[in-house]
Amino acid sequence: MLDLKKILNNPDYYRNILLNKKANISLFDELVKIGKKRGELMQKSQSLKAKINELSKSFIKLKTNEEKNELKAKISKIKKEQEQKEKKSELIDDRVFFLLANLPNIILDDVPFGEDENSNIVIEKKENLGNGLIVHDFSHYDIAEKFGLVDFKRASKLSGPRFVIFKNQGAKLARALMDFMLDTNIQKGYKEILPPFIVKGHNLFGTGQLPKFEEDLFKLENGMYLIPTAEVPVTNYYNDEIINLDKPKMFVSFTECFRSEAGSGGKDNRGLIRSHQFKKVEIVKITNEQDGIKEFEKTIEDASHLLELLEIPYQKVLLCSGDTSFSSMKTIDLELWLPSEKRFRETSSISYFGDFQGRRAKIRYKQNDKTYFAHTINGSALAIDRVFAALIELNYDSKNELIKIPEKLVPYFGSSQIARK
């Protein structure tokens, strides 16, 4: 959530950025208008309170009942006016909160303006890892089904389209990737959390999925939701708390993730790229303002390191304003190479949120006797299903009907290859 005081101090700056973030600008204009009105009412209310206090102090100096009654009437009249101003201000507060809740975050100065993904900027490529940018026509879902690693048909029978069953060596490979990613991140100082996969709605508000993106979520009864990402329960671990942030809080978490994929239409109907339920290892940091950008850069390095260890060619992409998510100030996507599609596909979005989520989730810290909202960072490290797909395609030996396992993953998987049976 944005800071109303900062908006009112510089409305033109915020308006321009939010236009480029594809915000509903009519909400912003209304916010500025009623925000100013709210400020005037609050200022007038405080002024009247001060006047009441001043008059009350003079009460003991009065000698006659007539003077006292006259002052009482005057104070009563002012108090009534003050209460009216305060009540009007409180009524405006509800609307201000609604408007702030539905406006996206601003962006950092180095984020380029742009409408959509076509304006994103590739800032680095690592093309020579493993077998490099090979191309072929063997899709991961065909290879995986041929080797008996997955079962899409029976998953559909159980749960409908966009679900998968990992089985045999496929289940083992998914588990190996999970353990490898968790262990590697833990070695870098992240603390592991295994949270609930069901959360209360206010937690989704805290991280910015609600109220704007409810259609993308799986809603249960009693205001409960399946998590779309570990970002939600892990960031909200400190919801409505004041914590010590002399050092960043660093967490890593494996979870199943659940998304309705509303609006995805016919995109990626087959395979592991876009599912209703998928596996992901997430890294989350909660920091003070001074450490925010530095820790964001470290988080990008940590997620990238996993792709390098797995020998997967990838590129780093700086998202433009129009493609940056609702809550994010800056996002770097890590995109891995898929030979059958002859293109890069996202496997991680590492985002810096400033105090946007901290303000919504009321996560605070003290510094020099003042209280501030925490800054947050998160990103996948990594999306297991998409890494699974890339590993199969990149390491498939069609001549010998083998899938080779990257060297760093062998201790977790227990073998250097998967043979077709």
Swiss-Prot record:
Q: Which GO terms describe its cellular component?
A: cytoplasm
Enzyme class per UniProt: ligase
Reactions catalysed: tRNA(Ser) + L-serine + ATP = L-seryl-tRNA(Ser) + AMP + diphosphate + H(+); tRNA(Sec) + L-serine + ATP = L-seryl-tRNA(Sec) + AMP + diphosphate + H(+)
Q: One MF term from GO for this chain?
A: serine-tRNA ligase activity
Keyword set, alphabetical order: Aminoacyl-tRNA synthetase, ATP-binding, Cytoplasm, Ligase, Nucleotide-binding, Protein biosynthesis
- Pathway this chain belongs to: Aminoacyl-tRNA biosynthesis; selenocysteinyl-tRNA(Sec) biosynthesis; L-seryl-tRNA(Sec) from L-serine and tRNA(Sec): step 1/1
Q: Which GO biological-process labels does this protein carry?
A: selenocysteine biosynthetic process; seryl-tRNA aminoacylation
Q: Which residues hold L-serine?
A: 229-231, 282, 380
The EC number of this protein is 6.1.1.11
Residues the entry annotates as binding ATP: 259-261, 346-349
What InterPro entries does its record include? aa-tRNA-synt_IIb, aa-tRNA-synth_II, aa-tRNA-synth_II/BPL/LPL, Ser-tRNA-ligase_type_1, Ser-tRNA-synth_1_N, SerRS_1_N_sf, tRNA-bd_arm
Where is the major localization of this protein?
A: cytoplasm
What the entry lists under PROSITE patterns is as follows: AA_TRNA_LIGASE_II
Q: Where does the protein end up? A: Cytoplasm
> Which family, according to the similarity comment?
Belongs to the class-II aminoacyl-tRNA synthetase family. Type-1 seryl-tRNA synthetase subfamily.
Record's function text: Catalyzes the attachment of serine to tRNA(Ser). Is also able to aminoacylate tRNA(Sec) with serine, to form the misacylated tRNA L-seryl-tRNA(Sec), which will be further converted into selenocysteinyl-tRNA(Sec).
- Quaternary structure (record): Homodimer. The tRNA molecule binds across the dimer.
Instruction: Return the domain comment text from this UniProt entry.
Output: Consists of two distinct domains, a catalytic core and a N-terminal extension that is involved in tRNA binding.
PANTHER family the UniProt entry points to: SERINE--TRNA LIGASE, SERYL-TRNA SYNTHETASE
UniProt protein name: Serine--tRNA ligase
Q: Which gene encodes it?
A: serS
